[in-house]
Swiss-Prot record:
Family, as annotated: Belongs to the long (4 C-C) scorpion toxin superfamily. Sodium channel inhibitor family.
Disulfide bonds: 13-38, 23-50, 27-52, 63-71
Gene for this chain: phtx3
Occurrences of domain LCN-type CS-alpha/beta (ranges): 1-72
Protein name as it appears in the record: Phaiodotoxin-3
Species of provenance: Anuroctonus phaiodactylus
The keyword ATP-binding belongs to this UniProt entry's keyword annotation: no
One GO cellular component, as annotated: extracellular space
Localization terms from the record: Secreted
Length: 72
C-alpha cells in the first residue's frame, strides 16, 4: 500500500488524487497518533513530504513531482 524509498527511510506517495489522505494513512500505519500532513522539504534538497508528528524516527514520508507545490 505504501511505497518505500530506496533507502527505506520514508514512504513515497505517488501523484494520485487524495495524496493528503495518503499522508494521514501512511503516518497512522507508521504508528503516529496524530494526523500526518504535507510539508515542503526544499531546504533539505528533497521533494515535498508527509510529516508524521511525534514519531521518534522516520518522521518524514515523501511526496514528489507535481505534488511538491501542494506540500508547502
Amino acid at each position: 500500500k505504501f511505497i518505500r524509498h530506496k533507502d527505506e527511510s520514508f514512504y513515497e506517495c505517488g501523484q494520485s488524487i487524495g495524496y493528503q489522505q495518503y499522508c494521514v494513512d501512511a503516518c497512522q500505519a507508521h504508528g503516529s497518533k496524530e494526523k500526518g500532513y504535507c510539508k515542503a522539504m526544499a531546504p533539505f534538497g528533497l521533494p515535498g513530504g508527509c510529516y508524521c508528528p511525534k514519531l521518534p524516527s522516520n518522521r518524514v514520508k515523501m511526496c514528489f513531482g507535481a505534488l511538491e507545490s501542494k506540500c508547502a
